[in-house]
Structures are given as structure tokens and as C-alpha cells.
Amino acid sequence: FLPSYLNYICGRRKRVVVTATGNEANARHHFQGRIIGEMEHEDAEITVEENTKGFFVELLASAPELYAVTIISPSGEQIPRILVRRGASEQFNFIFEGTTITVDYRIDTKETASRFIRPTPGLWTIRIFPQLTVTGNYHLWLPLRELTDGNNFFLRSNPEITLTSPSAARQVITVGGYQASNTSIYADSGRDYTITGEIKPDFVAPAVDVDGP
């Protein structure tokens, strides 16, 4: 993982790593969920644009939390609930949609990754079921805007915890951005705690409307 490697570099003498937070805060690519009490499940809905060739979604939770998922297409077609199995990888074909979905589980990082190939445009739903919960907190992320071929986003998104991967490393110097013309917040600049609780960015610098010679 990139953050681990950057932390290793920062631990060596005469080495400093500086990185930006990225511009994902306003992209609607982060969903923060919480399943508590008697809740049986929670839905994360993704709007998929026309002519999207494919994309992936990551679900991440902290140990010892475990979650199962099912996916519902815009037409209502639904795959069976996918239970957690170490190192499991399962592929599903939506008959009416012509869409293929691959779901991979990684227990070591409590991460689930789902790849959508030729997704039908419309509203896709990832339904999350608790298997083992302590806090009930989990997160889903879509790829960076530059890594997707369509404007796909969560219907109910959260702008927090939107740091790009390098900037979440504990020992790097992380820089956010602000509007230079009026010293106001730049809404797109990634921000908030990392998934492990570190406060980022370390400071902000002019990033928009910067005067030059």
C-alpha cells in the first residue's frame, strides 16, 4: 500500500514527503454509513451515467466489523446476499441489464471491492447487511474523477474523509487548498480525519485564483 511505503520513506534520515489532499471533497464519491440497533440493512445508492464502461466501489470497515452486501440494478434485478469469506471472489451477471459485477473480499483489511462492467445507466443500490458490528461504521468510495469515464456519484454522499490515498499516510506532510482571492475554503479540497483517525491536512496553501506575474 502506498501510505505504508511513504511512511517508510519518511522514517529515513533526510527524507520528507509532501503531498496534496486531492480534489474529491465535492465529487460525491464518498458514502459514510452506520448500522445500529435493530437496523437490518442500509442502502448506498449510486447514480450511473450513460455510456459508462465500468467502475469499481470499495467498502472499508475497521476490525472486527464484518458486512455482507447485495446489489440491486435499476430494473430491480438483485443478486443473492454475498457473505464474507476470506479471499473470496465472485462474479455475477445481470441478465436484463447486460452488466457483470465482480465482488472481492479481503478480510485482512476488512475491505470489499465491487467492479461493475458495462453498467446500465440509472440508480444502482448496494445493500449492506451487518454480520459483526461494534460501532456499525463503514465507508464506501468511488474512484477519483480522473479514473472514471462517467459522472457517477452517491445519491447520499459525505464530503468528509475524502483524502486521496497518499495524503492519508501518517508521516507525510499533507497540504490542502484554499481560494487565494478571498482566503475562503476551496470546496473541492479533500479534508477531515483519515480512516485511522489522524487529522489532515496539516496546513492549507493557495490553490484557486492564485495571482501570477
Please give the residue ranges for each predicted region.
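Loop-rich non-cytosolic ectodomains and luminal regions
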Residues: 1-213
